[in-house]
Amino acid sequence: MAALLVPGGGAAPGLVWRRRRAAVQCAAASPSSPDPSWRTNVVSDRVSVEPSPRTIHECEADVVSGNPPAAPAAPAKAKAPPGTPVVKPLRLTSRPRRNRKSAALRDAFQETTLTPANFILPLFIHEGEEDSPIGAMPGCSRLGWRHGLIDEVYKARDVGVNSVVLFPKIPDALKSSTGDEAYNPDGLVPRAIRTLKDKFPDLVIYTDVALDPYSSDGHDGIVREDGVIMNDETVHQLCKQAVAQAEAGADVVSPSDMMDGRVGAIRTALDEAGYYHVSIMAYTAKYASAFYEPFREELDSNPRFGDKKTYQMNPENYREALLEVHADESEGADILMVKPAMPYLHVIRLLRDTSALPISAYQVSGEYSMIKAAASQGMLDEKKAILESLLCIKRAGADVILTYAALQAARWLCGEK
């Protein structure tokens, strides 16, 4: 079967991973020592059995005459180990284990399926030409926006991951108290977006809308002299940032700042600029979490003073998420997010049960790094732990997952070791 080609992007994303997955499943299903009479011809992705020289009428006549062809004997009943007590079977009307007794049955009744299409790959970018590994996040690098970024997206698409979100490391000299660099049309993020769209027209690009990477104060908003984060003035800046990203070609803008009213204001700004087609992924329930540290260290976006508790949600609160859901829905959000993911699975389920909108969840840097650290010490099986962590986020109700393990997990799902 010929590859489906996309202009500038090579084989269509997802096609390669599906082929690899099918090849692995086909190999697993093939008999290791086939009976000589079981002859197969493999042509492309089809398996055919050569017909027997005997007619159907001859075969039926044998059966009718009481001379059926030989077949394997029924398997012998397995014996219990010595010392097993002899008991009467429990009189159970239901035995749920019956539906778990084989891999085929478990697969047939599996309620949650994880695929590379469920992943959004976060990518760190900077102005340099070289890629720089991130010590606190093994397997992740700060990518040069010209070359390293392109190479990483090629790798992602090769295993079916066709969605990325960009996070910039901004030079200190470009940071200011009002974060004006955030909406520079020739800034790092707009340039990266245009470069990616030139190479991969069908790539889905998410962007981060917030001032902290651009702020000399390290906060998500403009800081008043008494330390108060100014809400409405910040929203004004965020609208300009979102429009600049949309103009560059962003598909989805993602306000992560947690300012009140920012979703509605951004929706209005995008529409007035003619970007009706650009979606908004709202960071609906973003908690003031301890799990963000590796990310903030990488982007140098830690607040220079205080913390972010006056705008991010209190980890002790649950019902408050409902207020944010209703606000974001009414203001025009297209996707709702929970961040972090694993410590807040119940909040993901709350959003899933409350809203008909798609739900995203962010497996943040601390979650990712914990698994990596434990695996490096031999405390966890890395593959099993990562895939289980992502599966439980999906099971809780997330439609898409932002995860630094997207590439690794997609390769495993493709059958690669």
From Swiss-Prot:
Mg(2+) binds at residue 324. 5-aminolevulinate 2 binds at residues 365, 404. It is found in: Plastid, Chloroplast. One of its GO terms (biological process) is protoporphyrinogen IX biosynthetic process. It catalyses: 2 5-aminolevulinate = porphobilinogen + 2 H2O + H(+). Its cofactor is Mg(2+). Its EC number is 4.2.1.24. It holds the Pfam family ALAD. 5-aminolevulinate 1 binds at residues 296, 308. Residues 1-40 form a transit peptide. GO terms for molecular function: porphobilinogen synthase activity; zinc ion binding. One of its GO terms (cellular component) is chloroplast. The active site is at residues 286, 339. The keyword Lyase applies. Residues 63-92 are annotated as: Disordered. Pathway: Porphyrin-containing compound metabolism; protoporphyrin-IX biosynthesis; coproporphyrinogen-III from 5-aminolevulinate: step 1/4. Gene3D superfamilies: Aldolase class I. Keywords: Allosteric enzyme, Chlorophyll biosynthesis, Chloroplast, Heme biosynthesis, Lyase, Magnesium, Metal-binding, Plastid, Porphyrin biosynthesis, Transit peptide. Homooctamer. Catalyzes an early step in the biosynthesis of tetrapyrroles. Binds two molecules of 5-aminolevulinate per subunit, each at a distinct site, and catalyzes their condensation to form porphobilinogen. This is Delta-aminolevulinic acid dehydratase, chloroplastic. It comes from Selaginella martensii.
